[in-house]
Design a protein with these regions (language model features):
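Flanking helices and flexible, charged tails adjoining ferredoxin-like Fe-S electron-transfer domains
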Residues: 210, 386-396, 400, 419, ...
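Conserved acidic residues
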Residues: 60, 168, 256, 327, ...
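Short, structured coil segments at secondary-structure junctions
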Residues: 301, 324-325, 463, 482, ...
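Short beta-alpha connecting loops at secondary-structure transitions
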Residues: 272-278, 327-328, 437-445, 636-643
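N-terminal Rossmann-like dinucleotide/flavin-binding domain of flavoprotein oxidoreductases
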Residues: 435-481, 560-586, 591
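Rossmann-like dinucleotide/flavin-binding elements
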Residues: 395-427, 433, 468-480, 489-560, ...
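Flavin-dependent oxidoreductase catalytic cores
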Residues: 1-404, 408, 412, 416-419, ...
Length: 661
């Protein structure tokens, strides 16, 4: 058994914190994050199981996700409302469960403003001014006095319901480009009345909301603000302005905490930074809470300030608190990946932690599709009420399992089955485990996949999996092994584009392995819309090559999240990668590239390219599966062997297969 860390190891993060009338047992919190678990706009049993498990994992406080204050702020079927009294009873179940585990429970209340175009509820969206959040969006209705009063009343009513439901605190959402931030920002507020123009005027409506909620909940109830420290868009809120806003709000009304984030819902890098993926360095964002904390104290306001954005470990959280950069740290995605990260760290069980890698595939990626959030590294995320923890699912009759293939799916299946008590052997034809993870980590800005790969491999040893590398599997060797069950995780086969002209089209992997063979001027044709082509383009540009990115679609990266796409576009633009959409490469003879303009049907001839990379979807490798049909042993295909998809699906199906065994 591993030795428990003394709390002095995390002497800043693991000490209590007074926040208004509350005391958090430690300074780690789960900040508000949308889950899409709502049912009929009410909190669900799925919410209950999800938050109870994270409270049980040792966190100091949980802030429940964006609770809508008005019907025209719902936006999606799974959004949770607070203005309907029907929310009180299901919320009470959640608050009781979280408090029973020793954590504090707060709720964030929100109006989304112009982000909601009203398609779902057939309502009119509100905003300070008729300025859409993106070129593809619709302008909101500029709010009049009656609209403002309705939104204030919605905040007050929601606060009343949350207090009745047992919430111990409320956070007003003035960040991330939602309605109250839209009033604060000169980018979205161009009014010429008392609610626009000067900083004081732009703050007027958010302050009215704050004062109305404070009057409803009373002076002794914990009430705080989530604030963007910087919008990261020209003409928007800067950190200097955010400092002034925080100090002015604190001078005007009692505020018990500031939760400092950044960004706005703006179709630019601003939005990309909001859920910064593994390609984005989080360090610049971590200066924002420190700046606001200093500004508040300079004005005599000793108010706790929370920091957020890609804190993956308690050590990182402890360091920023120790340095005076924040009083507490929010770790949303880290808790999605590992609900017990606090307890496991303090108890010295670091090798059991599933570390967030900021891939954003299961969290942001699912939100964009209006689906419940998931997690690549934690397939159980969001299924806490349906899937018991593995420790409680021990095999009644251990089976002898043979897993063939040591990529994302095979590694997950092997470690999960072994943890449940099965006798597991894994064969891998290569000398190294990892499969497509090993290709991914060659890419710039994708190296954090190594963390997951190494954690999976370490678990093979921890749970006693027998690993044989350099092992070729065929029907005979599998039959001789005499397993009780076989999982095929042999992956997929790269497809080489068939083009006229006779010139070679490199695959993504070939280009990664031998970029010099492409020469200095590279054409990259992507049919997949996935990460690999994007990161290869950036990698080749980093090597000093001229890169032209051809896409048959109207844009690029249609299968990555908008957050990541916007960040990628910024980097590709900075590295002078040329992007040509609605273009299909039809021929290459080594010198002349023929491209069809899909908008006109005409062909274009491009001279000077020294190499071509064609990104195609892989095909499942079915060859071994066909050989095993005659075996009197259950054979289950998992990962890309079942169907080529993302690592999110590969890991999930590997985990699911092991649970089903």
């Amino acid at each position: 058994m591993q030795e428990r860390f003394a709390e002095t190891e995390f002497s800043h993060a693991m000490v209590p914190l007074a926040v208004g009338n509350l005391t958090f047992r430690n300074r780690i919190l789960v900040p508000a994050h949308t889950t899409n678990f709502g049912v009929n706009h009410l909190p669900s049993e799925r919410h209950l199981a999800y938050h109870r498990e994270r409270a049980r994992g040792g966190v100091g406080a949980i802030i429940f996700e964006s609770i809508r204050v008005h019907a025209n702020s719902l936006g999606r079927p799974q959004a949770v409302c607070g203005f309907d009294p029907a929310c009180i009873e299901p919320f009470r179940k959640i608050t009781d469960a979280v408090k029973a585990e020793g954590a504090r429970i707060l709720g964030q209340i929100i109006h989304l403003g112009r982000q909601v175009e009203g398609d779902f509820e057939r309502t009119v969206s509100f905003g300070p001014s008729p300025i859409p959040w993106a070129t593809s969006a619709l302008p909101p209705r500029p709010m009049d006095r009656a609209d403002m009063d309705a939104v204030i009343e919605g905040h007050v009513l929601t606060a009343r319901h949350l207090v009745a439901a047992g919430f111990e605190g409320i956070e007003l959402q003035m960040a991330h480009g939602h309605l109250l931030q839209q009033f604060l920002s000169p980018l979205s507020n161009t009014r010429d009345d008392a609610y626009g123009g000067s900083a004081e005027n732009r703050m007027r409506f958010p302050l009215e909301v704050l004062q109305a909620v404070r009057a409803e909940v009373g002076r002794d109830f914990c009430l705080g603000i989530r604030l963007s420290g910087d919008e990261y868009v020209e003409g928007g809120i800067t950190i200097d302005q955010a400092e002034e806003t925080a100090a002015a709000l604190a001078a005007a009304e009692k505020i018990d905490f500031f939760n400092v984030s950044h960004s706005a819902y703006h179709a630019s890098y601003s939005l990309a930074s909001q859920m910064a993926d593994m390609a984005i360095d989080p360090e610049p964002f971590r200066s924002l809470p420190a700046r606001i904390r200093i500004a508040l104290r300079d004005e005599g306001h000793d108010i706790p300030v929370f920091a957020v954005c890609r804190f993956n470990t308690l050590a990182e959280a402890d360091a920023i608190i120790a340095a005076g950069g924040a009083d507490a740290v929010g770790m949303a995605r880290a808790h999605l990946a590992e609900p017990a990260i606090v307890n496991k760290t303090v108890e010295g069980r670091m090798n059991e932690i599933r570390t967030c890698i900021a891939c954003n595939q299961g969290c942001a990626g699912m939100l964009e599709k209006n689906l419940p959030i998931r997690c690549l590294v934690n397939p159980r995320a969001g299924l806490e009420g349906e899937w018991a923890e593995l420790a409680a699912t021990g095999a009644q009759q251990p089976k002898r399992l043979l897993v063939i293939g040591g990529g994302p799916a095979g590694l997950e299946a092997a470690r999960t089955a072994a943890e449940r008590g099965h006798i597991v052997t894994l064969w891998e034809k290569h000398q190294n485990l990892g499969g497509q993870f090993r290709d991914a980590i060659k890419m710039p800005k994708r190296a954090e996949f190594r963390t997951l790969m190494e954690e999976q491999i370490a678990d093979l040893g921890r749970f006693g999996v027998t690993v044989v590398t350099g092992k070729h599997a065929d029907a005979g060797s599998i039959a001789d092994f005499a397993a009780d069950a076989v999982f095929l995780a042999t992956g997929s086969i790269p497809v080489r584009a068939e083009l006229a002209g006779g010139g070679k089209a490199f695959t993504i992997v070939e280009a990664l392995d031998d970029p010099a063979a492409l020469g200095s001027d590279v054409a990259l044709f992507d049919r997949t819309g996935e990460w690999a082509a994007l990161t290869l383009a950036e990698h080749l540009a980093d090597l000093g090559k001229k890169v032209t990115f051809f896409s048959p679609a109207g844009g690029i990266a249609w299968r990555t999240t908008i957050y990541s796409t916007l960040a990628n576009l910024k980097r590709l633009r900075e590295k002078k990668v040329r992007i040509a959409t609605l273009r299909k490469v039809t021929a290459f003879d080594g010198k002349i590239l023929t491209v069809e303009d899909l908008s006109t049907g005409e062909s274009e001839l491009h001279m000077g390219f020294t190499g071509l990379v064609a990104a195609e979807h892989n095909f499942a490798d079915q060859s071994l599966f066909q050989q095993l049909r005659h075996l009197d042993v259950p054979v289950r295909q998992i990962g890309d062997n079942l169907a080529p998809r993302t690592a999110l699906e590969a890991v999930y199906h590997g985990h699911l297969a092991a649970r089903d065994l």
